[in-house]
Amino acid sequence: FEVIGPRALHSLPEHDALFIRTVTAVDHVSFRFSQTAESLGMPVIDDPQSIVRCSNKIYLHELCERHGIPMLPAMIVSRKTPAAELHTLGFPVVLKAPDGSFSAAVRRAEKPVDLDRLLAEMLAKSPLLLAQPFSPTDFDWRIGVLEGRLLYACKYHMARGHWQIAQYDGKGGSRSGRVEG
């Protein structure tokens, strides 16, 4: 295999398949690569449909709900949502921007005063958030699908001593948990 960078879109037709190993989002260069690979008839992970579906947490929540897939209770939050309504989820509560990935734009409020502060910060950047009760876990799953079929599942473990798979230091650095699979 060959590693290609974000400026190598023109060379994509020279390859047999594309396995994206960077952040995926509709407004990211990875999406253009994915669309181009699909239009060339190449196998691609992550395919454009998966990026659209999985990069928006609110869309994904509604899709799972519609298909009866079990998940944590959740609430879609806007500036008009009374904070008291969010308290019904209990504390700690996790707030997620719709388009964050790899632990970015996911924050945890331990108590009501934290919730008020985080809501103000996050709603200044996004009109909607997804709120869920915090449920401790040792890992998240990443599922790979190719042409509608399960290809792989791997565990993304939480960063050591942290509640997310990635811990950011606020200076552009981060550390991650180990990956299995």
Give short role names for the model-derived ranges:
Residues 1-73:
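Conserved N-proximal alpha/beta basic substrate-recognition cap immediately N-terminal to
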Residues 19-21, 62-65, 90-93, 112-113, ...:
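Short, hinge-like loop/turn segments at secondary-structure boundaries
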Residues 23, 79, 98:
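Flexible loop residues that form catalytic
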Residues 63-70, 114, 121-124:
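Basic phosphate/pyrophosphate-binding loop/patch that engages nucleotide-derived ligands
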Residues 64-65, 89-105, 126-141, 154:
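ATP-grasp fold ATP-binding core
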Residues 68-94:
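Rossmann-like NAD(P)H-binding beta-loop-alpha module
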Residues 69-70, 99-103, 179-180:
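Short glycine-enriched loop/turn motifs at secondary-structure junctions
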Residues 112-122, 133-181:
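ATP-dependent carboxylate/phosphate-activation module, predominantly the ATP-grasp catalytic core
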